[in-house]
């Protein structure tokens, strides 16, 4: 009989002990996100969550997203602390625009070789995002897959479920001529347009860690976490009759605002109502990007656009600004049968 070397899972590149060490590292921060509806703790085959009792006809709203190639920039710069916030933001902001309160969140973290410090940093960010949005982090999957990813490169995906009263779903159907559009300021490019961002960095030859913009490194502007609007928007919805909300993600103004507009309406955006944050001016100049392309690839300083009746506008602005948002009137809704659903003038 020929002697054979005894192989283990670790020999194949999967370190179960590292995975267990990660779970031990994150238990504390995950526990802080717990909601009263969550049943049980980490470690079950599935996470259990009851519906809040205040809903008469609860409708579940679900969403999933990632952070795109912002992740590549974060890995290149070895800055992982905000990626988790981005991940949660991209999911919960999509839920709240339909009037939904986020209930619970799950994450998927995949890598070629698990680095416990990096993964813990990302998941700490996820927990922070859940705290900011009032959402429970109920579970996740950490997949160490040698040969699937280069070295310690990783990818993340998030999954979120929220709930809304059936009669209070916001779907844009009540948007009408004369409605006022209110903008909520963004914290930067959020998590969209980063393939173009990275191309601009490459073509311009700049070093984002040493290139300064408004007194701080370009990298700080680009890796600023996506703003989470959940608590401000839920309070707005509770006090104001909101007709529609658009989350400005991939596709920018041109593609996201029309998603919440009824037929025969047009959003007219007043470009002079705000000044682009410096990072967008830099991207446009460094990349020689056209105005139209800027509004398609980036949010240009606007994270959400909210439609409501004109008499409610001032009250809404006061509430949002009191909650810490940078909110302003950005435009109006006009009746139009034009194929151009958004006009920026």
From Swiss-Prot:
Pathway: Purine metabolism; IMP biosynthesis via de novo pathway; 5-amino-1-(5-phospho-D-ribosyl)imidazole from N(2)-formyl-N(1)-(5-phospho-D-ribosyl)glycinamide: step 2/2. SUPFAM superfamilies: PurM C-terminal domain-like, PurM N-terminal domain-like. Keywords: ATP-binding, Cytoplasm, Ligase, Nucleotide-binding, Purine biosynthesis. CDD domains: PurM (cd02196). GO terms for biological process: 'de novo' IMP biosynthetic process; adenine biosynthetic process. It is found in: Cytoplasm. It catalyses: 2-formamido-N(1)-(5-O-phospho-beta-D-ribosyl)acetamidine + ATP = 5-amino-1-(5-phospho-beta-D-ribosyl)imidazole + ADP + phosphate + H(+). The keyword GTP-binding does not apply. One of its GO terms (molecular function) is phosphoribosylamine-glycine ligase activity. GO terms for cellular component: cytosol. Its main location: cytoplasm. Transmembrane segments: none annotated. Belongs to the AIR synthase family. NCBIfam families: purM. This is Phosphoribosylformylglycinamidine cyclo-ligase. It comes from Salmonella typhi. The gene is purM.
